[in-house]
Regions:
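Switch II (G3) loop of P-loop NTPases
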Residues: 4-13, 19-40
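Charged, low-complexity, helix/coiled-coil-prone segments
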Residues: 14-25, 67-74, 145-146
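Conserved catalytic-core segment of NTP-binding enzymes
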Residues: 29-131
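Charged phosphate-binding loop/patch that engages nucleotide di/tri-phosphates or the phosphate backbone
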Residues: 127-146
Length: 146
């Protein structure tokens, strides 16, 4: 498996992303990737520059909806050239029709513990993530741009 690093928005993007563990593993970012840093730029700028593949985790709302921030962050990734692999809905109900209509690159959902579809949904998510990761690697995602 890959090493999982935990970082927060207060850490230096350049220092963190230049570490071998960040280049070869997964990063769980806690905070707002679009928040402007005092020295300029934001984490999302750095992730785009380093071609770090991204998966956005989005909280599900009652009834299976998601906040508009999901579309806003996906658009910002596109604008900055950040390699967005896809979005994953956390919790609530999975509304396949709504997810198709919003046109975002959804990978699936992670149902709450105890939900009957949990194992099937997680298996599907692993398959989609694997396929998209292979595609990302083949297109040079993860290679730092100077």
């Amino acid at each position: 498996g890959l090493e999982l690093s935990h970082i927060s928005e207060g850490e230096s993007p350049q220092e963190t992303l230049s570490k071998p563990s960040a280049q070869q593993g997964l990063i769980r970012f806690c905070g707002d990737v679009a928040r402007q840093r005092p020295e300029g730029g934001c984490w999302l700028d750095a992730l785009a520059d380093w071609r770090q593949p991204l998966v956005l985790m989005v909280a599900g709302e009652a009834g299976g909806g998601v906040a508009g921030a999901a579309a806003a962050y996906a658009a910002l990734c596109h604008q900055l050239g950040a390699p967005l692999i896809g979005l994953v809905q956390i919790g609530s109900q999975w509304n396949r029709l709504q997810r198709r209509r919003d046109g975002l690159p959804w990978m699936g959902w992670i149902p709450a513990a105890g939900v009957p579809e949990r194992e099937l949904a997680l298996d599907h998510l692993v398959q989609v993530l694997s396929r998209r990761s292979i595609t990302a690697a083949a297109t040079g995602v993860g290679a730092h741009r100077p």
